[in-house]
């Protein structure tokens, strides 16, 4: 690629791949135990109209360097945590791909143990795909981000720079900035004065804001594509205001030298009465324009009974609404996060998707984008909560094998005593950014899938203790560590949260690294949290913008997508 940010990282990944390919490992043996498919065969499969899940089990940071367009990243270290949600049907056609180093073989063994019966491996991984003349992509959620850029080209979505927006505000003009990101991103950093309205909520909540028609509405996100789809959502809805997307979002705002707010919780109110009815009618009009289908509970049951097709039932309401009561057969997703990040919610292309929203507005608007984004069998469920029992709390994934884990536990105060007496070694399997922000003093960062490597660096003590942020991942790591080390292993009860709750010491930084910190693909907006005005941040942000702008052209060359974007006039 032309931008140096991704090119340098990709070159390093290829060098590591060539080095590891020279070593015969158990991964290579496992690789040969499963059917192999060639790059040309996989290319044919992508367009044969049948369901397919292309899975890349490398760590996110490695995956982000180079991968297939349709590959979904399910890291080997966390495979159990996501697999049943991401691939709900055990007979799904699954193709594993990696960098040629053999991670696919290890993942194939696990998938077989979990009951998946139709697993094959791309021979040679993405390097073989590239050598066959096919496009390889860098970055995360590429298909969704490409869709955002694609629709902008076709709809000619209006945009404004941060400087142009600030000039309007300085002149005293009426300007309303709507931040289209989820609330957890908004509270972390936001443009001063902006109101948080996630994209799927824009039409739902807009009329309740009582915006005068002469107000300029500017939609922002962290970068580009969510603001673009957000702005185009309001335009598609036919609101009378002039609407524009902020070019570059919070990253460009920072680069322009403008301050951000932190810890803000401003959000648009929930609609009621006439405003709710107006939102619903608007959403219905848009859905009709794009051929969105609404199905009954009876039709949903028929889909659930179909053993030959995959089905994803996704609840689009806010986190609080979901926790208050949700269908037991649903998973959680949030609007445009779904449209531009289906790789985080569903791994099977050509599957059926049913969207849930008690008011239907959010589901109808989201579905209007999904059917354009090559998810043609996307439906909205009518009366989704009628006659069904509801679960409460957060989504609880089924984790294969977790019910068989009975690890010894240690409380935070007891662990602190052992650490002071130098009788324990702590291994932290939280993500590397969380570890950097704060961890138990002396704890070693490690990635679960690399415990063999980690144990060669970690000083041995009489007790090994595993901690982290995800209880299931901590338990799985404890089980693996006991098997590999042959030593007594326990897990910290309550994990890192319990340690903090006990007001015990916390250390920041990359203190003890037992493995690489490539579990996260560090995107520029994350860099901005630490060094917002550094030359490195600005260089990375500009490279990111360049990368996004290149995506439509690269998709044209790849000829792998089937976006169905048409003008509003063509649909009337």
Label each region the model flagged.
Residues 2, 6, 28-53, 60-176, ...:
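Rhodanese-like catalytic fold shared by cysteine-dependent sulfurtransferases
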Residues 13-27:
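Bacterial N-terminal signal peptides
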